Amino acid sequence: LPVPDYTPQTVATREAELNAPPLHAEWHEAARQRHTRDRLAVLSGVWKSILVDRILATVGADRFSAMPDPSLATNPFSAICRQLACLYDQGPPSVTNPTAEARGFDVAGLTRTITRAGYWARMQAQQRLVLGLREVLVHVAIDEGRPLFLFATPDQVVARARPERPDQPVRIEWLRKARVDVAGAVAGTPAVPELRREQWTLWVWDVADPEAPYHRVYALGQGQWRSSGMGAAAEVSGIDVTEQLLGGRFDGDAYPFRRRPTLREERRAAELGVPAVGVPILPWVVYHAAPNGAAIFSAYDEIELFDGTLDVAAKQGFVDHAFLDASWPQRYVIGAVPVGGSVHPDDAGHVAHVPTDPASVLILQKLQDYDGQPMIGQYQAGADPAALQGVVSGQIEALATNAGVAPSDVQRLGGTARSGVAIALSQGGKRDMQRRYAPVFRDADERLVALVATLWNRWSESPEGLAVFGEEAPPAYPESGYEVHYQSLPLSPAEREARRKDVLERLAAGLVSRVDAYAELHDVSREEAAVRLAAMDGPDGDDDDDDADDLREELVAALAALEGALGVDGLPRAAREALEDARDQARAAVEG
């Protein structure tokens, strides 16, 4: 049989088939891009060429030619990531900012804006990508007062960080397609619409030097591209088309993505007689699947699950081959020949074809030149598909365990051996996964809410925003201090009763406060529980509530700790400013 058109040469063209962005010239960046691209293909269902590569490497071309077309049905990598991604299943998380709300800021309005833009709904699907690719980046922009969220996978991005904070990018390079007039950019003339051609471009945001940030766009050539360094020393192998695509330059003070100037920055600017500008920021948020303080990307984490998926999918192809072609006894004939059947033409003439299906009846005729008694027999079946399938299912369950899924949290769908592929988490297992991933995603979500507030404030202060609001003063949102709390999966009646009984018993024994008990029962923060209890108690409630006193004491202690931290010499400027903002918020909460 001829080998299907899945040779390594045709498989190597899958980057072009998937319209993948060009690879970086540095080998480690290119390797990361390729590996991430393969993971994305498996998660997206376009990985047949990758699977064929693995089968060819496992069994060789001759044995592969006898196998059926590879099936993509066995994909534990995608299935497990889908089951683990349950943090946003119960709807949008609650977003609070106790300090800002006490000052009268409309935090609920910002929350509604983000929800209506569809962000939390999209995160239900994007969390699966984060878990599979280990990182996903989100670009935030404001268009006519509405936030826009663009998700970028790591194979489209190169990011750089300072050595002292290797997990926080200060430069992001994003590969995107755009229509540009390269000749006009080289000549320095206005772009001609008829000469614009779609090609890969590199969008760069750089805040490595807070005094000289910039946002630029470069048109890339064919093949690999190069970039190195950051700040003023950065180099890119492309043609600058910033003015052609963005309509201007955004370097230095013209860089638009900034936080609101602090009082200290305003005083410093007034002394120098220049306008006050805030600290430049990147309009990006990086989502991690696990805490990673050593690097921005962790592309090879959990590679066992990805590699194991290719292994079991290749073995599943062999199981299918055994089931279709070797699961019944093979017949043999000595001294006789089958008769009848259908005749099919071929290159050499006409060939008679007699199907030997297990359900067929063979009519045999003795060979004229055979002197002995014809013999008919059969060998045993070449393979036991049930036993082979059991091995594959066991490996899939082992992959789920290695991914952090406890066997007690897995409920199988169906009763067949192959149901091991369709692993589903129980409700209790999903709640465990929510608790596992909430701290990691909460940090990114809180950064994103603060980033939306910051960019919205800058937009509302721009001529476009002022034109929308006219004489009415646009609302301003706080640019820090947000807290995100996720909605956990509901408990069953039995689980709910057991939790209520346990909390009430501990409350009666004096082991927890009312605030802690309410927070545990309703799955909210301690601060929000205190606010709700105060509202329930009403204006005639006990002003000497122990929980309120405890909360105030904690705020006073935090304020003292912040004052002490600010007294340390040699603090970096950014760290000192962050501490000053936190101190101001704590002081306002104590005074309020």
Language model regions located:
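Extended, helix-rich architectural segments
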Residues: 1-196
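Extended, regular secondary-structure scaffolds
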Residues: 127-133, 137-298
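Extended, charged amphipathic alpha-helical segments
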Residues: 244-425, 466-473, 480, 485-491
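Extended amphipathic alpha-helical segments with heptad-repeat/coiled-coil character used for oligomerization
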Residues: 425-506
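Long, highly charged low-complexity segments enriched in Glu/Asp and Lys/Arg with interspersed Ser/Thr
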Residues: 516, 520-547
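Long, hydrophobic or amphipathic alpha-helical segments
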Residues: 548-559, 565, 569
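Generic L/I/V-rich hydrophobic alpha-helical segments across diverse proteins
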Residues: 555, 559-562, 579, 583-586
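Charged, low-complexity interaction regions
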Residues: 564-578, 592
